[in-house]
């Protein structure tokens, strides 16, 4: 499961925040940015690099590494929250900052809060759980924006597995409370992975 979370990070979080910070460093030469702003943006890029490395080396079973990852998350989130000079609008900046938080929360949840249920699903060799991947198929290979949006729209139908099988699997195996927590985490994360889906069918 951590595999697609890493892909989600690269595709929807890192590219966005890296662009925001790199623009800030370039813009520091302009009239709207100070040298201090440019330095702050560079620090964010350094923290982003550290964060990406921790994601790549993350061992979900190593509690020490998870704590380090969480600290890196908090540091990166704080850095971008306080970044003043960027050509991104406040709304765009807030979106990227929130995406960092959502991604980090999802990783911590999967590695800690959902681990027991995940073990149970693996033990019963759940086909739905094994096959589940909310990342739209081959979207990373597509460059046409219109086609990307179409793929994302289609992904809404299978975001929680074929015929929403993840709801049934998790509820039957781990209970409704676990499903509610799982649904909440991944609905929050969905904005960067797929189009704005209507998940009211789960309410």
Swiss-Prot record:
Top-level taxonomic group: Eukaryota
Key word Transmembrane helix present: no
Coiled coil: none
Keywords: Glycoprotein, Secreted, Signal
Assigned protein family: Belongs to the UPF0376 family.
PANTHER family: DUF19 DOMAIN-CONTAINING PROTEIN-RELATED, DUF19 DOMAIN-CONTAINING PROTEIN-RELATED-RELATED
Protein name, per record: Excretory canal abnormal exc-13
Organism: Caenorhabditis elegans
